[in-house]
């Protein structure tokens, strides 16, 4: 899409200073209306365009395999309506202590043996206390020493904590926006949108790659999906890693029973993310358990080039590794760096 106006993006500093993060400037690179226009393209036209953009920057027949391990499950103080790990919801997830280092390393070794090149560690905290950070940094150092790309998601960070993680060698920090600013208050009340932008700014300032995406299928409108993508695409730079999650409904959470998103709308979201953030790793994340193989293939056509791989994605199911390998083989898609 050719833009006649001057490009304006959102810097790390302005992420922290903007009082109304949804008030994108008139000359933003991707206005919400521009993104909505992409969503409205005929399906085949949208996928064709996304595949063209994808091929300009990536091998269209290669994906990265990522594994996500919950290193500290349950008991989170936040009230995110989708999350079974929230202490506010009765979803049957018990609070657990932080995993021991050797348990994490065993999981990382298994992930690498199964072909993963990226290992993500998630802890259900509102924000990590300083005493929690040292053991997590040990995990980062040891997992990185195995030759795996490292990512953690620990909740909100302070600037000095982001710097400590950088010094430990962390490659990526994940902190999702979840949805558009306008819809956000219907999903979460214990953390503001600006809180999220602040953490992303600290991560960026520390020199850590940003992993930031969202969740669709939470009852939001297409305009809200366009608003999420616009927020991401106007960051300067936009995130290196963009996970797109399809809501996994868990009994006991407020979003259980939400009308499911049309599968083709999910594919459209992947395609729009690819077009607006052409060099990002667009990750097909939560919700794959409910997707048939044809839908996953469409997601790859739309520009997804990473999947989360293994038995569990935090506390919800994920297709088994053997099934994933079989699907990739049928599609002649190679796993990055895997010779198995």
Swiss-Prot record:
Q: How is the cofactor bound?
A: Binds 1 [4Fe-4S] cluster. The cluster is coordinated with 3 cysteines and an exchangeable S-adenosyl-L-methionine.
Per UniProt, the keywords (alphabetical) are: 2Fe-2S, 4Fe-4S, Biotin biosynthesis, Iron, Iron-sulfur, Metal-binding, S-adenosyl-L-methionine, Transferase
Q: What is its EC number?
A: 2.8.1.6
Q: Could you tell me the Gene Ontology terms of the biological process aspect for this record? A: biotin biosynthetic process
Q: Which domain of life is it from?
A: Bacteria
Q: Which residues bind [4Fe-4S] cluster?
A: 76, 80, 83
Q: Show the GO MF annotations.
A: 2 iron, 2 sulfur cluster binding; 4 iron, 4 sulfur cluster binding; biotin synthase activity; iron ion binding
Q: Catalyzes what?
A: (4R,5S)-dethiobiotin + (sulfur carrier)-SH + 2 reduced [2Fe-2S]-[ferredoxin] + 2 S-adenosyl-L-methionine = (sulfur carrier)-H + biotin + 2 5'-deoxyadenosine + 2 L-methionine + 2 oxidized [2Fe-2S]-[ferredoxin]
* Reported cofactor(s): [4Fe-4S] cluster; [2Fe-2S] cluster
State which residue ranges cross the membrane: none
- The record lists [2Fe-2S] cluster as bound by 120, 151, 211, 283
Every copy of the Radical SAM core domain together lies at 61-288
Q: In which pathway does it act?
A: Cofactor biosynthesis; biotin biosynthesis; biotin from 7,8-diaminononanoate: step 2/2
InterPro entries listed in its UniProt record? Aldolase_TIM, BATS_dom, Biotin_synth/BioAB, Biotin_synthase, Elp3/MiaA/NifB-like_rSAM, rSAM
Q: What class of enzyme is it?
A: transferase
Oligomeric state and interaction partners are given as:
Homodimer.
What does this chain do? Catalyzes the conversion of dethiobiotin (DTB) to biotin by the insertion of a sulfur atom into dethiobiotin via a radical-based mechanism.
Which family does the record assign?
Answer: Belongs to the radical SAM superfamily. Biotin synthase family.
UniProt name for this protein = Biotin synthase
Gene encoding it?
bioB
């Amino acid at each position: 899409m050719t833009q006649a106006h001057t490009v304006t993006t959102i810097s790390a500093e302005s992420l922290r200073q903007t009082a109304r993060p949804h008030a994108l400037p008139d000359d933003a690179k991707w206005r919400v209306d521009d993104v909505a226009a992409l969503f409205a393209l005929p399906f085949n036209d949208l996928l064709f365009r996304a595949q063209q953009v994808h091929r300009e920057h990536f091998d269209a027949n290669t994906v990265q395999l990522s594994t996500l391990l919950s290193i500290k499950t349950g008991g989170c103080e936040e009230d995110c309506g989708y999350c079974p790990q929230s202490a506010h919801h009765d979803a049957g997830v018990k609070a657990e202590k932080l995993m021991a280092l050797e348990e994490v390393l065993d999981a990382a070794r298994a992930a690498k043996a199964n072909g993963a090149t990226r290992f993500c560690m998630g802890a259900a905290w509102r924000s990590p206390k300083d005493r929690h950070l040292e053991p997590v940094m040990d995990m980062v150092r040891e997992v990185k020493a195995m030759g795996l790309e490292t990512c953690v998601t620990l909740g909100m960070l302070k600037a000095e904590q982001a710097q400590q993680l950088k010094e430990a060698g962390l490659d990526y920090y994940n902190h999702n926006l979840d949805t558009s600013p306008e819809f956000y208050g219907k999903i979460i009340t214990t953390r503001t949108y600006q809180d999220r932008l602040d953490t992303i700014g600290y991560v960026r300032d520390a020199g850590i790659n940003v992993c930031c995406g969202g969740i669709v299928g939470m009852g939001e409108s297409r305009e809200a999906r366009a608003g999420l993508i616009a927020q991401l695409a106007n960051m300067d730079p936009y995130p290196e890693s963009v996970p797109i999650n399809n809501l996994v409904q868990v009994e006991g959470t407020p979003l259980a029973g939400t009308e499911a998103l049309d599968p083709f709308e999910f594919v459209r979201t992947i395609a729009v993310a690819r077009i607006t953030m052409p060099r990002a790793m667009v990750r097909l994340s939560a919700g794959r358990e409910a997707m048939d193989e044809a839908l996953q293939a469409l997601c790859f056509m739309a520009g997804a080039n990473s999947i989360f791989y293994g038995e569990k994605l935090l506390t919800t199911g994920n297709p088994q590794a053997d099934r994933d390998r079989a699907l990739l083989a049928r599609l002649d898609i190679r796993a990055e760096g895997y010779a198995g």
